C-alpha cells in the first residue's frame, strides 16, 4: 500500500501559493499556480515589489516592480515521505517598473529617465517546503532577479516566506 503522504508532490499534482517578499529594507508579494513533475515543479504567477534608492537630494526614489513570471524548480533533496523538500532553479519574468508611484518627490525633480519602463529578466531561486499537514506547506526561499531593462538597479535579491496549498 502506498503511503498518501508521499503522494503530495507526485507528478501532476497542482497547487496555489502566496508569498511575502522582503529584501531587508522593502517588501513585496507573490502569488502563483504550479504543478509538480517527476523531478520538481513548474509555476506561473504574478509578483509586485516596492523598492527605494537614494538620490543626490535628501529624498529617496521609490519604485515598484510588477511582473508576471514562469519558472521551473528542480528537487535537489527531500525526505523519504517528501514532507520536507529543497528545490533550486529559476525562471523568466516581464512587467513594468514604475518610478515614484506615490508622487512623493518634489514636482521639480528631474529623473532623467521615464516614470515607467518595460521590465524583463531572469532569476535564480532556492526554495524549501515544509508540509505542516497533508495538503498545506510552509515555503521559505531566496530569489535573485537580474533585470535587463531596469533604469535603477539591475540586480535585486528577495527572501520569501509563504504558504502552499495542494489542489
Task: List each model region and its residues.
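Cleavable N-terminal export/targeting peptides
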Residues: 1-11
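Acidic, glycine-rich flexible loop segments
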Residues: 119-126, 130, 140
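Transmembrane beta-strand segments that form the barrel wall of outer-membrane beta-barrel proteins
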Residues: 10-24, 29, 41-52, 138-148
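Transmembrane beta-barrel architecture of outer-membrane proteins
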Residues: 13-15, 26-28, 65-69, 119-123, ...
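Outer-membrane beta-barrel domain signature
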Residues: 47-48, 53-54, 97-98, 102-104, ...
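Gram-negative (and chloroplast) outer-membrane scaffold detector with strong preference
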Residues: 32-107, 132, 136, 165-167
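Outer-membrane beta-barrel "beta-signal"
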Residues: 155-167
Amino acid at each position: 500500500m502506498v503511503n498518501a503522504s508521499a503522494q503530495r508532490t507526485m507528478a501532476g499534482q497542482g497547487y496555489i501559493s502566496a508569498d511575502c517578499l522582503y529584501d531587508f529594507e522593502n517588501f513585496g508579494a507573490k502569488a502563483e499556480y504550479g504543478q509538480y513533475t517527476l523531478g520538481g515543479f513548474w509555476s506561473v504567477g504574478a509578483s509586485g515589489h516596492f523598492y527605494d534608492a537614494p538620490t543626490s537630494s535628501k529624498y529617496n526614489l521609490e519604485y515598484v516592480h510588477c511582473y508576471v513570471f514562469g519558472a521551473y524548480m528542480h528537487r535537489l533533496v527531500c525526505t523519504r515521505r517528501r514532507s520536507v523538500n529543497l528545490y533550486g532553479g529559476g525562471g523568466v519574468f516581464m512587467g513594468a517598473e514604475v518610478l515614484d508611484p506615490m508622487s512623493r518627490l518634489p514636482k521639480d525633480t528631474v529623473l532623467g529617465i521615464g516614470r515607467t519602463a518595460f521590465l524583463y529578466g531572469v532569476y535564480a531561486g532556492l526554495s524549501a517546503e515544509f508540509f505542516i499537514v497533508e495538503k498545506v506547506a510552509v515555503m521559505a526561499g531566496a530569489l535573485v532577479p537580474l533585470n535587463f531593462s531596469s533604469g535603477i538597479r539591475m540586480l535585486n535579491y528577495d527572501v520569501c516566506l509563504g504558504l502552499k496549498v495542494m489542489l
